[in-house]
A protein has these predicted regions:
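Short beta-alpha connecting loops at secondary-structure transitions
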Residues: 4-13, 31-38, 228-233
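Flexible, low-complexity linker and terminal segments
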Residues: 53-252
Length: 252
């Protein structure tokens, strides 16, 4: 769980932000598949935490629940019985010491499929390709989940893009101003097909984030989707509905 607050260094440790999306996407040595979910409230957090654990077990990859202090220390209520069951789908049950009759190997060095250290160039390429293949398989797996949430009335031509704890306030603004609200639940692998489907008929995009550089907006731009305007807040405080409504109106 990565609960974001303002930095750098100690920063504002008791306030909130959305400043570590890029860090979550790139932290670590080398190139490998990772799963990142960005819940927008307690119900999402409960659900995607279970999905994250399942995906890590099934694909043997790290999962990050990218949240923020607003959610981490917020008070929510929801019907826990409404959350559909997430069944474990681990391909294999990992072995743990001191299980009898097995050998447990954990090797951070490059290794072959048997876990034996190797520096062979052919095997190195094969193992790297195997790791990267998980990205495609994971993207296919995620098609059965609601990886992008949408909220709208009618057929608006302007959309608000948000993520994390900004979603509830954006949804309220969307209803009052007649805008579509699009909120990705998954950051990596980014659900670009579902995201493009959500933006059908949209001519103008406004990105709303709690950071200074528009990190989600930059990620969206990298997929060839133009973000027309940004509303960025980075004083450590979450958006209030009133200030956000005024900011959105100024962009329309």
């Amino acid at each position: 769980v990565l609960g974001q607050r303002p930095g750098p260094s100690t920063g504002l440790p008791t306030y909130t932000s959305q400043t570590e999306l890029n860090f979550a996407l790139s932290a670590g040595q080398g190139e490998f598949t990772r799963f990142i979910a960005a819940p927008s409230d307690a119900e999402d957090s409960y659900y995607w935490a279970a999905v994250s654990l399942n995906i890590s077990k099934k694909f043997r990859i790290p999962s990050i629940l990218l949240t923020d202090k607003t959610i981490c220390e917020g008070l929510f209520n929801f019907d826990i019985d409404s959350i559909r069951e997430i069944k474990s789908e681990a391909a294999q049950v990992p072995a743990f010491p001191p299980d009898k009759g097995i050998m447990v190997k954990a090797n951070s060095y490059e290794h072959d499929v048997s876990g034996i250290t190797t520096e062979d160039p052919v095997k190195t390429v094969q193992m790297q390709n195997n790791r990267l293949m998980k990205t495609k398989l994971l993207a296919e797996e995620l098609e059965k989940y609601e990886t992008v949430k949408c909220f709208c009335n009618g057929k608006p031509d302007t959309a608000i893009i948000c993520w994390g704890s900004n979603r509830p306030a954006c949804e309220e603004i969307g209803k009052s101003l007649g805008l579509k609200v699009v909120c990705p639940m998954v950051i990596s692998p980014f659900p670009i097909d579902a995201f493009k489907t959500a933006l059908k008929g949209i001519k103008r995009i406004i990105s709303i984030e709690n950071n200074a550089t528009g990190q989600l907006g930059a990620l969206i731009n990298s997929y060839g989707i133009k973000v027309n305007d940004q509303i960025l807040k980075y004083d450590g405080r979450p958006f209030s509905v009133d200030e956000l409504e005024a900011a959105v109106k100024s962009k329309l």
